[in-house]
Every structure is written in structure tokens, then in C-alpha cells.
Swiss-Prot record:
The keyword Cytoplasm does not apply. It is an enzyme of class 1 (oxidoreductase). Belongs to the short-chain dehydrogenases/reductases (SDR) family. InterPro entries: NAD(P)-bd_dom_sf (IPR036291), Sc_DH/Rdtase_CS (IPR020904), SDR_fam (IPR002347). The lineage of its organism: Eukaryota, Fungi, Dikarya, Ascomycota, Pezizomycotina. The gene is RED2. The active site is at 178 (proton donor), 182 (lowers pka of active site tyr). This is Short-chain dehydrogenase RED2. It comes from the Eukaryota. Induction: Expression is increased in rice-extract medium (REM) and is correlated with the production of pyriculol. NADP(+) binds at residues 15, 70, 132, 178, 182, 211, 213. Its EC number is 1.1.1.-. Short-chain dehydrogenase; part of the gene cluster that mediates the biosynthesis of pyriculol and pyriculariol, two heptaketides that induce lesion formation upon application on rice leaves but are dispensable for pathogenicity. The highly reducing polyketide synthase synthesizes the heptaketide backbone of pyriculol and pyriculariol. Pyriculol and pyriculariol contain several hydroxyl moieties and double bonds, so it can be assumed that several reduction steps occur during biosynthesis.
Length: 278
């Protein structure tokens, strides 16, 4: 099922980039991309316009604009959401993929309190601020039919998809800051889904394990033993493509997922299915 309506994507690289391009291909009526790096957001918006042209959806994509956001700053988030509302008129889909990865991999006895705090500022507080602001916006929007030829699906004011992690289900050695933050995001997703359900707003998360993104590539450079850990822990024998995660996000945004809220979709090539001994 295609996604119509307008989309607000936070995060201009990796999974966020893949989601924005997927929205452009699928014919959204408008798109706003936000990132702490405004130049990256502007570049992605231009790429989305070109992608819509190549996919034959340029007529549907009325606009693709960019703005800056620091998700850990309340005022910055409010300004970005206001920009999206002004440009798009309404936000039907919000995908929040902003986040940071581990820089210092240590056992808990040697873990950095500074990095722990930084991880929570972006990955937890940032997720909270974005979900809070977008929920408030969507509550003011008129409900629209989920699918006109299937009235039993009811109406919707919008949906939010948060990028979680398989680390919310299984811990990774020497990554206490990331594992703890992603467990918090899991709880936030469930709480937001419960609070928003009566307003016709769905909230879900996608929880991948290792994905081929710039953040993971940096982690592989910073933590030499990580590559072997990945190779031995993923039953499918490879890491995910960002496009594969975007496909899951598109499903959760689509009418096909109209009864899904509070879900935390694990997308990990089987990583969390078993323990790994030896």
C-alpha cells in the first residue's frame, strides 16, 4: 500500500535518508527533512525531489523542504515541528531516526558517565521531545479516513514511527549506555501509543540490530572487535540495508498497519532469537 499525505523525517543520513527517499518514491504529497546538519537536510530534500521525478511521483510530491533541528533542545524541536506544519499544512507521518552511537565501548566498571549522559540527551530526551511535540500537533489535526474503501479501519490523525533498536531486547557487551537508552525508548513508544490511541494517532517503533549506516561504520572503526561480534551474532550472516529498515517503516505508516500501535518491530536477521555461545 502506498503512503499518501505528508511526511516529516528527522535524521538526514542512514535510515532517515532511506525513509525520506522511500516516502518520495511512494508519492507523499509533501516532505520535510530535519537534521542537526542543515546542509545534509537540504541535500537530502533535493535528492528526494530528484527521486520523485525518477519514480514518476513528482506530481504528487508538492514540496520537499529542509530545516535544522537539535532533538535534545526543546525550543529547536518546537521550531522544527512548526516549520513542518507551516510547509505541509499537516503531518500525517513522522519518522524520528535521530540518534547517536557508542564512541567508548567499555565494561560497566569503566563506562563513561559523560557519554552515558550524552546518549540519554539525544536518544532518550530527544525522542521524548520529538514525540511530545508531534503528538501535540497531530491532536489538533482533523481526522481523515485510513482507507476510503475500507471504512471499518476508521480514521486517523497521523502516525509516528520511532527508530528503536534490537538492543532493547538483548544487551550487547560493553555498550551499557546504548542498551539502556534503547530500553527507555521502548517504554516511551508504548506509553506514547497508549496515550495517543484515543486521538487516532498510532505510535510504533522499528528495532533493527546492525544496519549499514554511517553511524555503524564509525562504530566499526572505533571498536575493532565489533565486526567479529556482528559476524558471529547474526544468523542471517549479514547486517541490514538501510532500505530494508525503511521498508518496515513504510509498512507501519501505511493503511496495512492501521491496527498496529505500541508495536516494537524487531528487524535483526534473527539476532535476538538465540544465545550465542563460544
Amino acid at each position: 500500500m502506498n503512503t499518501t499525505g505528508s511526511a516529516f523525517v528527522i535524521g538526514a543520513s542512514g535510515i532517515g535518508r532511506a525513509c525520506a527517499l522511500a516516502f518520495a518514491r511512494r508519492g507523499v504529497s509533501g516532505l520535510v527533512v530535519a537534521d542537526v546538519d542543515l546542509q545534509a537536510a537540504e541535500s537530502l530534500a533535493a535528492e528526494c525531489r530528484a527521486e520523485a521525478g525518477s519514480a514518476g511521483t513528482a506530481d504528487a510530491l508538492g514540496c520537499a523542504e529542509a530545516t535544522r533541528v537539535d532533538v535534545a533542545d526543546e525550543r529547536s524541536v518546537e521550531l522544527a515541528v512548526s516549520f513542518a506544519r507551516r510547509v505541509l499544512g499537516r503531518v500525517d507521518y513522522c519518522v524520528n531516526s535521530a540518534g547517536i552511537g557508542v564512541k567508548l565501548a567499555n565494561e560497566i566498571a569503566d563506562a563513561s558517565p559523560v557519554e552515558f549522559e550524552a546518549m540519554f540527551q539525544v536518544n532518550v530526551k530527544g525522542t521524548f521531545l520529538v514525540t511530545r511535540a508531534v503528538s501535540a500537533l497531530m491532536k489538533t489535526q482533523d481526522p481523515v479516513p485510513v482507507l476510503r474503501d475500507s471504512p471499518g479501519r476508521g480514521t486517523t490523525r497521523g502516525c509516528i514511527v520511532i527508530l528503536g533498536s534490537a538492543a532493547a531486547f538483548a544487551a550487547t557487551p560493553k555498550m551499557v549506555q546504548y542498551t539502556t537508552a534503547k530500553h527507555a525508548v521502548l517504554g516511551l513508544t508504548k506509553s506514547a501509543a497508549l496515550d495517543n490511541a484515543a486521538h487516532g494517532i498510532r505510535v510504533n517503533s522499528v528495532c533493527p540490530s546492525w544496519v549499514d549506516t554511517p553511524m555503524v561504520r564509525r562504530a566499526l572503526q572505533d571498536v575493532p572487535e565489533l565486526e567479529q561480534t556482528i559476524r558471529t551474532s547474526v544468523p542471517m550472516g549479514r547486517i541490514a540495508l538501510a532500505e530494508e529498515v525503511a521498508d518496515a517503516v513504510m509498512f507501519l505508516c501505511s493503511p496495512g498497519a492501521s491496527y498496529a500501535t505500541g508495536c516494537n518491530m524487531i528487524l535483526d536477521g534473527g539476532t535476538t532469537l538465540t544465545t550465542h555461545l563460544g
